[in-house]
Amino acid sequence: MIDDLYSARILSLAANLPRAGRLSAPEGTGEKIAKLCGSRAIVDVTLDDQARVKDFAQDVKACALGQAGAGVVGEAAIGSTFAEIEAARDAMLAMLKSGGNGPDNRFEGLRILKQVADYPARHASSMVAIEALLEAVRQAMAKHHTNTRTRIAGAA
């Protein structure tokens, strides 16, 4: 039954979204929308000098599953690297599509959405936050790379 998807933990994560809002001066912003249901996540980030997420905020308008995914992402994002986020996204996709175990380490909490695998129409809404975070970090890294090249060229 689809009601089994909405456990107390999922509803708790959905109701207590960490780091809600927007950053005033993000280095990267990612937005993802689940076309089927309209769930949407906008994520803003800044990075530290080692390309780890230094600050993070999210504006999420989603169903309980999308909100729950965003809740886990909000708890885990600070300090994460692009590689960690990408691995978590890939592991989550494998969990939903092909029976994988799901993310580990800092994003292990996304495993709470494992039973969403049985409901393909809910996959995209469960993914909006991690996908938006990945896009935001990719954008911020490109900006950091451009700024580094500009500083090097200016020093020459």
What are these model-predicted stretches?
Residues 13-60:
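Structured beta-strand/loop patches that form or line metal/cofactor-binding pockets in enzymes
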Residues 37, 63, 125:
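Functionally engaged cysteine thiol sites
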Residues 69-81:
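Alpha-helical support elements that line or immediately flank enzyme active sites
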Residues 42, 51, 74, 83-87, ...:
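Short, surface-exposed, polar/charged, turn-prone segments marking secondary-structure boundaries
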Residues 60-67:
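Short, thiol/selenol-centered motifs that function as redox-active sites or metal-ligating centers
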Residues 1-21, 30, 80-156:
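C-terminal binding/interaction regions
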